[in-house]
């Protein structure tokens, strides 16, 4: 996995009180929407009246709070220094549906992965459509609350946020710059197929075993497509609703047409999110003479 961006960035701190938006430098805002329910977002309060660039961060997958209490202090799903960012940007964060701003999160002692009980609202609502529509509404609202430079409205999407950011570019004319990190070029389903083919090529499994696995994957994909709005059925830790919505997106189709500057970061050694899709996107844009996308591969 992309080492530079750890899932949790541990902040050694003396804070013993419960974290809240104010103590971390944010102003909370709740948007009430008939379709999406409550959209909870936060914008930095530092120099809110000063004209400067705006940065909307779109985090990765999972029902995790933005800030997470741990034994050694607290962690965050934010992969950059907030204090530094707030000097130059109006920073904007969005909670996923039903997920609190901060809460205690356990970590599996063997794998180190976070363990957190999924809120019911998250289960019922989380989809690509929810995240993209919520982000679009937040951008429209926050640009009325802070003095944002309309020529410098950026998004930073990581992992699942890569997909969200890509889809947002197809909808919102407010975004002027984008950084998209560790995401897919094709549908997310294709990564599972690529992974098995690569394991066969590398000799980890036989080609026959790979084909059996891939045939099983196609069976699952058909089941998801047959019940695309189900929040009762799960696969790989996510509802069918979540999978069907995100798998419907093929980022290369959008990114190969965008005109704004986009900086793509690809993790070349990531086995879960294949770099091949972004390699294809890079080739496609270069053949088309597109110059707005920069491609940055990292181990």
Predicted regions and their residues:
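N-terminal cap/lid segment of alpha/beta-hydrolase-fold proteins
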Residues: 18-50
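Short, surface-exposed "cap/lid" segments of acyl-processing enzymes
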Residues: 48-88, 100, 104
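Alpha/beta-hydrolase active-site loop
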Residues: 105-145
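Accessory cap/linker subdomain of secreted extracellular hydrolases
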Residues: 113, 125, 179-257
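Primarily recognizes the serine-hydrolase "nucleophile elbow" in alpha/beta-hydrolase
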Residues: 141-145, 150-198
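Short beta-strand/loop motif that positions the catalytic acidic residue
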Residues: 258, 264-266
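Conserved alpha/beta-hydrolase "acid-adjacent" motif
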Residues: 271-280
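Catalytic histidine neighborhood in serine/cysteine hydrolases
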Residues: 286-299
């Amino acid at each position: 996995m992309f080492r530079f961006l750890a899932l949790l960035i541990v902040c050694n701190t003396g804070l013993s009180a419960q974290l809240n938006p104010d103590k971390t430098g944010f102003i909370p805002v709740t948007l009430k929407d008939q379709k999406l329910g409550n959209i909870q977002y936060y914008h930095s309060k530092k120099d809110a009246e000063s004209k400067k660039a705006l940065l909307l961060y779109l985090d990765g997958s999972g029902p995790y709070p933005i800030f997470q209490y741990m034994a050694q202090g607290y962690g965050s799903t934010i992969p950059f220094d907030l204090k530094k960012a707030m000097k130059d940007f109006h920073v904007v964060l969005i909670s996923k549906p039903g997920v609190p701003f901060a809460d205690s999160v356990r970590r599996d002692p063997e794998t180190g992965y976070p363990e957190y009980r999924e809120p019911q609202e998250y289960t019922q609502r989380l989809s690509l459509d929810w995240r993209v529509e919520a982000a679009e509404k937040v951008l429209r609202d926050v640009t009325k609350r802070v003095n944002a430079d309309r020529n410098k409205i950026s998004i930073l999407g990581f992992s699942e946020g890569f997909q969200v950011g890509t889809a947002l570019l197809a909808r919102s004319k407010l975004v002027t710059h984008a950084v998209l990190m560790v995401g897919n070029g094709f549908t997310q389903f294709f990564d599972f197929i690529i992974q098995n083919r690569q394991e066969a090529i590398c000799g980890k499994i036989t080609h026959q075993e790979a084909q059996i696995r891939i045939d099983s994957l196609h069976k699952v994909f058909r089941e998801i497509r047959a019940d695309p709005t189900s929040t009762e059925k799960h696969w790989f830790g996510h509802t069918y609703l979540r999978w069907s919505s995100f798998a419907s997106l093929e980022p290369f189709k959008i990114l190969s047409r965008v005109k704004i500057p986009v900086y793509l970061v690809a993790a070349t050694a990531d086995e879960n999110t294949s770099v091949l899709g972004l390699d294809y996107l890079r080739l496609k844009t270069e053949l088309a003479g597109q110059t707005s996308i920069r491609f940055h591969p990292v181990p």
